[in-house]
Amino acid sequence: MGTGNQTWVREFVLLGLSSDWDTEVSLFVLFLITYMVTVLGNFLIILLIRLDSRLHTPMYFFLTNLSLVDVSYATSIIPQMLAHLLAAHKAIPFVSCAAQLFFSLGLGGIEFVLLAVMAYDRYVAVCDPLRYSVIMHGGLCTRLAITSWVSGSMNSLMQTVITFQLPMCTNKYIDHISCELLAVVRLACVDTSSNEIAIMVSSIVLLMTPFCLVLLSYIQIISTILKIQSTEGRKKAFHTCASHLTVVVLCYGMAIFTYIQPRSSPSVLQEKLISLFYSVLTPMLNPMIYSVRNKEVKGAWQKLLGQLTGITSKLAT
């Protein structure tokens, strides 16, 4: 198809969740509170890990990276969504839309790879505890973290460039809460079959490969736990992985449902709700999951609160 006489869009319009003003105001308040809790919760986790020497281990090094990813991911979507909820004209410039797609897609990919890395860390901790400190040394942890960030970013850059080279013509209405990959691809006025195949292949590489590594890790972990004779030992080993396993189910479950089969994807409303849950709630829930289900983190919280209480008491007297 020739594109010489086509008009190219300079901005997109995000249709969002609702056009009712009262609903939009309610959503604004809800998402603002959620975003504040997300930022506060994740930065508190990072601060806690920095302050407590007992948490200076590979597991919490990766958790620090995960918290940074969660805050960044939420920031790539929620502030723009908040602005649009109170705006009469919900436009987003072409460049801003491309940037949002790049950062949200990249940070999502980084999180998937990080979760696989964290699964490997738990595998070594449970299945080979005597050699844990030798295997999971600082150099390896740094390389694994860098690999996560680079792989997610490179995939996102490739997908963003391919997507925004498509001719969008005059079709500028994105029926989504953000510049989401599949929603933007649907705007193209050419056949996008090859793009959808590229999305599926990319999803398999960056989503299913880490997911398979997570599955293999947990098969070995469960097998090792079942061989432990004492009930107390099994409980301790399971609690070592409980927080990570919960986060894995949340993150991978929704992403697989959304991306692996783009042609047989759910309805637009379902896609919006899935994306909303993944981009708004998951970054908020992750620090809560690690705080509630992890004894070491809870112990560090109690120690920090005790120190703060002591300082407050001294200042009061």
From Swiss-Prot:
Give me the Gene Ontology terms describing cellular component.
plasma membrane
Entry keyword annotation includes Metal-binding:
no
Instruction: Provide the glycosylation site positions.
Output: 5
Q: Tell me, what is one Gene Ontology molecular-function annotation carried by this entry?
A: G protein-coupled receptor activity
- Spans within the Extracellular topological domain: 1-25, 80-100, 159-196, 261-272
Q: SUPFAM superfamilies from the entry?
A: Family A G protein-coupled receptor-like (SSF81321)
Q: Transmembrane ranges? A: 26-49, 58-79, 101-120, 140-158, 197-219, 237-260, 273-292
Q: What does the record say about its membrane topology?
A: Multi-pass membrane protein
Role of this protein: Putative odorant or sperm cell receptor.
Q: Which family does it belong to?
A: Belongs to the G-protein coupled receptor 1 family.
- The protein here is known as Olfactory receptor-like protein OLF3
Species name = Canis lupus familiaris (Dog)
